[in-house]
Design a protein with these regions (language model features):
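Sec-dependent bacterial lipoprotein signal peptides
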Residues: 1-18
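Extracytoplasmic copper-binding redox domains, predominantly the cupredoxin/blue-copper superfamily
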Residues: 14, 19-117
Length: 117
């Protein structure tokens, strides 16, 4: 009886541990983010593609596929701003229509625009 209790408690612990680790997993690629547009930040110091058009309420996902760190910063410095280390993603939802130019604050000339209808 005691051995059965220990085995049962062990299985419960393993199940909880497995569930808790999977529930803390985050998307590690834009493909699994559900975003309407995916943009790559590259070691060539460009966003590719540099423009995207979405509908308000949709999201854009930026992924750093290179080895250099980047940022994704709206030109007004208030709409969105995130660091983008190598291998990471940043997802932003655009609630309103408009044109949203952005840049990497680390690399001059690394720019793009999101158009939201």
């Amino acid at each position: 009886m005691r051995a059965t209790l220990h085995v049962s408690l062990g299985l419960v612990f393993l199940t909880v541990a497995a569930c808790s680790s999977s529930s803390t997993m985050v998307a590690n690629s834009c493909g699994s983010s559900g975003a309407a547009a995916n943009i790559n930040a590259t070691d060539a110091k460009v966003f590719s593609p540099s423009t995207a058009t979405i509908t308000h309420g949709q999201s854009v996902c930026w992924q750093n596929n290179g080895s250099s760190s980047h940022t994704v910063t709206s030109n007004d410095n208030t709409s969105f701003n995130s660091s983008l280390p190598s291998g990471q993603i940043f997802v932003h939802t655009f609630p309103t229509a408009g044109s949203f130019p952005y840049r990497c604050t680390i690399h001059a000339g690394m720019t793009g625009t999101i158009t939201v209808n």
